[in-house]
């Protein structure tokens, strides 16, 4: 039986406990402030918020580049001779990480590295990797065709649902994603956009919620749980640093009230926080297998 490794990027926001539990290898994306490139996940997230408060500018983000992937994959193969690697990439339409990993694999002629497009971000990637780990554990003792297993793992993308709500549009406006007029109206009416990850992996704004995070948490979570037929193993509770503790507690209460056996908090890291800012709230889940 060959050793199977799981790898991903820091934009997956996989909590440290799950990195250890699933033995995941993480390639850092990058956060750039005043021309200095920092590895995402290797510095306190408060630096992102402090930088914006001090300068009025949001840090920029950059993907893992092809050369970094080549070094990353070589290191894994050198340390684990004969291994098979399944790399779970941040949504290919939301970042160039996927295309850079694909180029690295093709240009360097790597064998036995299979690239999976999660078509998701942050907590959605976390949910994906957790479900993929379970599937790999079920298959690893008998698997003969690693490419076929990769196809099964890619098919999981149809069953991952992820949504989040920024607490403020300030960062989105600073990044040019929201007009000044829209920002002004949203502030006056206390509107917060729902950001959904669609089936292609695109982040799209759909409906709007009105009120504070405390006021909208129940409706947001219950709307999601009514819309999707979720597996009841684990509900992934996404949050940006700064979200009030009572809102965090209520997120978990709603999950348990709706029959989930467990919950997993996922704090958004530098990549998402550069766009969503402080105190965002989100949810991710694995849906049940449809039987036709």
Predicted segment positions?
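N-terminal glycine-rich anion-binding loop in soluble enzyme alpha/beta folds
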Residues: 4-70
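Mixed-charge interfacial surface used for oligomerization/domain docking
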Residues: 2-3, 11-32, 83, 93, ...
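Short, charged beta->alpha transition segments
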Residues: 69-76, 100-104
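Non-transmembrane, interaction-prone segments in cytosolic or luminal domains
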Residues: 50-53, 59, 79, 209-210, ...
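Glycine-rich phosphate-binding loop signature in dinucleotide/nucleotide-binding domains
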Residues: 76-84
